[in-house]
Structures are given as structure tokens and as C-alpha cells.
């Protein structure tokens, strides 16, 4: 299915380039029409992160939704998982998050959630795409049937309480010194407050958004500042969220980064011991390290792999009854609690394990030695470099060289014009060589 607007995580691109007020208006109208089912008054909740362009896109979306008769509840800056949760809690027909996640401030995006709090499937996105470019003039509501917009003031308190309730009442964070990096993004208020209310000594960074500094040298894609602060303040743990707080990485007390694969390993082992896993396994993507698969195998658990994107992980979880899944990048999905990746909730579940075991984070969180894994990105302007004969030949040769000693994954990004080339295996030299071979071929084809 060819997509014009939607990628693997909603619609995303440069603000006032791809993501224009005109497009946001049309998305609001199209999505509003698709989700006006039944004869009740329809409503949509809209949240955003802290990008400057969020104001522009929010206003255009409001115009679009209200013009087709939908009421709008404005949440302001909140994490993506808060939008998913509040869509269900407030009985909305649709939820919208304005964010480009871990991308720089120049980008923005529009993510859509259904009334059940789950991201939309491909079929519904295709239906919306079909209406975006349609003539809306005859579909607009009459003057007496326009929607209203209202700002909701209690959003942060609701989400904080929701996050806290994912822990047993007897679990506190007393005695823990926690550094939390909010990436100058959507969780800049709720994450420190939640940790403090649970009893932690909280040191917060990345909590001064100005519209331009989201993800800039902070957050889960730039953990250096968090590592330095953990070491400087002798903290027990560091928590790095991204711009919309749907992903998380951990830094242990020694300043070592713990990625999503290790987090899934920790939780899977704990939940297996507590008989909380609904299936004997975990769902991850093709990018997760082979070391995770081997570790889980040693526990008698399987690793099911999907295409890259937390939506595909979640779709597989729902279809096959899993309650734990995620991505190496830090999207951790715990479907007992959430309908999407939730960085704060994932961090709280890890902290619960740390408190129960009463051991340093470095001893709890490094469950396996990851195999050498090399990932390189090749940017291209247009065309389909992966279809070039020279690239196909290079990929086939690289796979032959790896044989059964590793994996090679080549894929286009779903959010930017980039080809990602990843290989892993027991022999680092061989892994480097096959990645370089493919990268060189793609680079020449993309020139």
C-alpha cells in the first residue's frame, strides 16, 4: 500500500515544509469525518510536546476538527502516552499527539490514536489519507453544528496518578537518588513530580523548554549530560526520556547506558519469576540484539520479531496475547498498563525491580553481553537506492559472508530519507566489514 502522508509513526516532517497549517487543517477534517460514528456529540483530545511549531499545528488542527463538528479538548504539553490514556479516560473518539518524538525542533508530526487508546492501523490511516486531498466544501458542518474547543487544566495530575498506580501501593522509591532527563520535552513537569511523589530524591535536567531546545544535547538520544550528572551527583540511577516521553533509556550508577533490549530482559526475567507473562516470550523488532534472543532462550522464553516501529510490536502483541514488548531504542510496551510505549511507566517498573532486589542498577540491568552490532545511516535525496542492482548484489554478498554467524538488516527509515544498515555477529571485524560493504554500495547508488 503506497502512502502519501503517513509513515511508520503518523505524519512527520519539517514544520512549515511538510507539516504545514494547511495539511494539519486537512488532517483534522479528514480524521474528524472518519471518527464521527454514532449519533452522540463527538470529541477529540489534542496534546503536544514543546516545539515552537506546536502552537501553529495545534491551532490548525482545532480549526479542522471543529469545522466538521467535533469538539476539541486541548491538553497542552503532555507525553504521548498521556494522550493515549486520556483518549480512553475522557471517552473521546480520537486522540492526537503533535510531536516528532526524538527529532530536532525543526521537525514536527501528527500521531493519531483511536478511542481505545491504540495507534491507528494501516486501513484507517489509508481511509484518512483518501480524504485529506478530497474536496471538503460539501462535508463541512453547518453554522449551528460547529465544534467547540476547551483547554483541560487537570491533565498533569491525572497522568501522574495513572503512572503511580502502575506500581503496587507498598512500593516506594525511598532512598533512591534519581537523575531524570526530560529532553526539554513533553515530560518536563510530570516525570520529576511523579518520581518525587513516590519518594525519590530527584535531580532533574532537560526541564527548561523554550520551543527550540527539545532533544538538543539532552534526552534518550544524547545521554552524555545525564551520564555526567549521574556520576557527579553519585546518583543510583539516571532516566533519559525523549521529546514526547514514549521511550526511555537508563544510566546505571557507574554511568553505563542500559538500552531497551536490556530493559526488556530485566522485566521479562522478573515477570517470568512472578508468573506475570501472558505468553512465554517477548515481542521486539528486527533491530533487537541477538544477545537478547539468546538470553531469553536461556529462560525458556521466545523472542518474536516484527518490522521496526512500536506500532508493529504492539499489533503483534495484541494479535498473539503478549503483554511485554518493545524496541532497542527504548520504546517499552507493557500492555497490562498502557496502549503505547511509555517511558515513565517503563522506568517505574524497572525501579520496582531494583527496589525489590536491593541491588545496584549495574547488577540488575546488564543481563546479557550484547553481540557486536554496527548501525550506519546513509542519507539520500530521492529514488529507491535499495532497488539498484549494485546494492542488491552487495547485500547478497554481505549475507553470504556472515552466514549463520550473525544477522544483516537493511531498511529505509519510516520517518526520514535515510537507509539504515545494521549487522551483528560474534566477530566484530566481520560485522564492520559487511556493514561497510553495503554502506559503500548504497552511498554510490544514492549519489
Curated annotation (Swiss-Prot):
Modifications made to the protein after synthesis: Activated by phosphorylation.
Any one Pfam family match given in the protein's UniProt record, by short name: PGM_PMM_I
Gene3D superfamilies in UniProt: Alpha-D-Glucose-1,6-Bisphosphate, subunit A, domain 3, Alpha-D-phosphohexomutase, C-terminal domain
InterPro entries: A-D-PHexomutase_a/b/a-I, A-D-PHexomutase_a/b/a-I/II/III, A-D-PHexomutase_a/b/a-II, A-D-PHexomutase_a/b/a-III, A-D-PHexomutase_C, A-D-PHexomutase_C_sf, A-D-PHexomutase_CS, Alpha-D-phosphohexomutase_SF
GO MF annotation list: magnesium ion binding; phosphoglucosamine mutase activity; phosphomannomutase activity
Cofactor: Mg(2+)
Reactions catalysed, as given in the entry: alpha-D-glucosamine 1-phosphate = D-glucosamine 6-phosphate
Protein name: Phosphoglucosamine mutase
Gene that encodes the chain: glmM
